[in-house]
A protein has these predicted regions:
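Acidic/histidine-rich alpha-helical segments that form the ligand environment
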Residues: 19, 25-28, 84-140
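Short, contiguous alpha-helical
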Residues: 34-89, 127, 131-135, 139-185
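A short small-residue
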Residues: 1-2, 33-34, 102-110, 149-152
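Intrinsically disordered, low-complexity segments enriched in polar/charged residues with Gly/Pro
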Residues: 12-13, 20-21, 27-29, 151-153
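Short amphipathic alpha-helical segments with heptad-repeat character
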Residues: 10-13, 17, 48, 52, ...
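Active-site oxyanion-binding pockets that recognize sulfate/phosphate
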Residues: 2-9, 41-44, 111-119, 155, ...
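Extreme N-terminal tail/first-helix region
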Residues: 1-17, 21
Length: 185
């Protein structure tokens, strides 16, 4: 995949804004609805906590790479790597459908005692992501590399990491909205 940096960042900012707006609607729900579970599936709060756990890693990693690469000349074009493009495409919601995957144990929030603070923590992370995405406008997203949460042995191009992380948020927003709709039916 090849795309202009600004077009990519604008798309990721749009997706981040949509996710933020979706979660702000969840703030008005009673805690019982936020904790509601259907079978072995996650609750709305568990979906958000899962994203918070990933945010704890990726937001720090993204910021670290922005700082490490800010003095390099930026490139106008982002060229996705093979592995990064694969992971990003695996996460992306396509036609309202998501590929089901098993979450790593350290990112699985099932049966945690979660409160409304899970939502405020998520919204703070979304604010931080917005700032970082805007900072990426002056970074070469192809040359800058970032670690991934599964293993430190693999590094992705920063643009692919941004896509993966943003698409991952989007897929769990869809999951949380489905949980919310199930309760209404």
């Amino acid at each position: 995949m090849e795309i202009e940096n600004d077009i990519l960042i604008d798309d990721l900012l749009r997706r981040t804004k949509q996710s933020t707006e979706r979660v702000k609607r969840f703030e008005r729900l009673p805690i019982s609805q936020l904790r509601f579970k259907s079978g072995s599936r996650w609750s709305i709060l568990e979906c958000l906590e899962h994203l918070n756990l990933y945010g704890d890693f990726y937001l720090v990693e993204i910021e670290k790479q922005i700082i490490a690469n800010r003095n390099r000349p930026p490139s106008r074009i982002f060229r996705s790597g093979f592995v990064g493009n694969y992971f990003a495409n695996l996460m992306e919601v396509k036609e309202g459908k998501i590929t089901k995957m098993k979450s790593p144990k350290n990112k699985n929030p099932a049966n945690m005692d979660l409160t409304i603070t899970t939502i405020s923590r998520f919204l703070k992370q979304q604010e931080q992501l917005t700032v970082l995405l805007n900072s990426c406008r002056s970074i070469d997203l192809t040359r800058a590399k970032s670690a991934i949460s599964l293993t430190r042995l693999i590094k992705l191009r920063l643009g692919d990491t941004l896509r993966f992380f943003t698409y991952h948020i989007e897929r769990h927003m869809l999951q949380a909205e489905r949980i919310c709709k199930e309760q209404i039916l």
